Amino acid sequence: MITETAYAKINLALHVRSKREDGYHEIETLFAFVDAGDVLVARAAEADRLETVGEFADVLDNPFDNLVARTMSTLPREGGLHVTLEKNLPVAAGLGGGSADAGAMFRIIEQMHGLPDDWEEKAIRLGADVPACVASEMAIGRGTGTDLEPVENDMAGMAVLLVNLRVPLPTGPVFKAWADTAGGEDLGPLPTGTAREIARKGRNDLRPPAVAICPPIADVLQALEATDPWMCEMSGSGATCFALYDETEMRDKAARAIAEHHPGWWQMTGTLQ
């Protein structure tokens, strides 16, 4: 039996550069991963079987057509797998939950059976975030997010607080709103430097269109800003927001304050990998 965490992905910066002819967008982003997320448990079986449990298991559109099931059918191997997916991350939340699940599944199959030589191509076909989620290490992503570059990670161990309104926000409408409301304007490349420098100087170009679609996101950011974090921002296309702290005690104090004043909001704590 193998247990893997599907680490929550956050974008410490996300610059949208242009829309491509194929409909996808050229982006530059700083991927980071939290040491918490969904949990997958796998064991050998005669045939593939996927069981979903956890707080958000019932909101999966089709638990048998999610990225875990698709990963299992994509990677060749001998024998089946019985996989239990504990869905702790909200869906359509900007945390790469499905991609993180797929990344964990790649790591499980690598340990049990090994991966094919073309595994990266298979990962890309499953989703733009999947290659980054397989490694689950801080990296710069370019293109659609699949072209990964190393970055000096001087943020490992920082305390993280994730907060979500419990409102799903699909990626497609946010990118469309970016083109409509921002006119698709390129506001410039990702800064250079260490992870801290990029995160501090960077931006999330999808935050304005996401807030236009879901205005309460601004309330989450305001609540997080009031806890005096090192930085706070929306992750990906939203609606999850994150705050980073140099001290665990500050994060825990912030989490208690958020829970007290906004008991209906979802939250998760962890540290950056």
Swiss-Prot record:
**GO terms for molecular function, please?**
4-(cytidine 5'-diphospho)-2-C-methyl-D-erythritol kinase activity; ATP binding
Q: Which InterPro entries does the entry mention?
A: GHMP_kinase_C_dom, GHMP_kinase_C_sf, GHMP_kinase_N_dom, IspE, Ribosomal_Su5_D2-typ_SF, Ribsml_uS5_D2-typ_fold_subgr
Asked if the Swiss-Prot or TrEMBL record annotates the protein with the keyword Ribonucleoprotein, the reply is no
Q: Which Gene3D superfamilies match?
A: 3.30.230.10, GHMP kinase, C-terminal domain
Recorded superkingdom: Bacteria
Keywords of the record, alphabetical order, are: ATP-binding, Isoprene biosynthesis, Kinase, Nucleotide-binding, Transferase
UniProt pathway annotation: Isoprenoid biosynthesis; isopentenyl diphosphate biosynthesis via DXP pathway; isopentenyl diphosphate from 1-deoxy-D-xylulose 5-phosphate: step 3/6
Active-site residues, as the UniProt record annotates them: 9, 129
| GO BP annotations, alphabetical order | isopentenyl diphosphate biosynthetic process, methylerythritol 4-phosphate pathway; terpenoid biosynthetic process
On whether Repeat is a keyword of this UniProt record, the answer is no
Question: So what EC number does this one have?
Answer: 2.7.1.148
Where along the sequence do coiled-coil regions lie? none
Q: Where does ATP bind?
A: 90-100
Q: Which reactions are catalysed by this chain?
A: 4-CDP-2-C-methyl-D-erythritol + ATP = 4-CDP-2-C-methyl-D-erythritol 2-phosphate + ADP + H(+)
Going by the record, the broad EC class of this enzyme is transferase
Fetch the Pfam families from UniProt.
GHMP_kinases_C (PF08544), GHMP_kinases_N (PF00288)
Q: What does this protein do?
A: Catalyzes the phosphorylation of the position 2 hydroxy group of 4-diphosphocytidyl-2C-methyl-D-erythritol.
Alphabetical list of NCBIfam families matching this protein: PRK14608.1
Give the record's family classification: Belongs to the GHMP kinase family. IspE subfamily.
This chain belongs to the protein called: 4-diphosphocytidyl-2-C-methyl-D-erythritol kinase
User: In which organism is this protein found?
Assistant: Erythrobacter litoralis (strain HTCC2594)
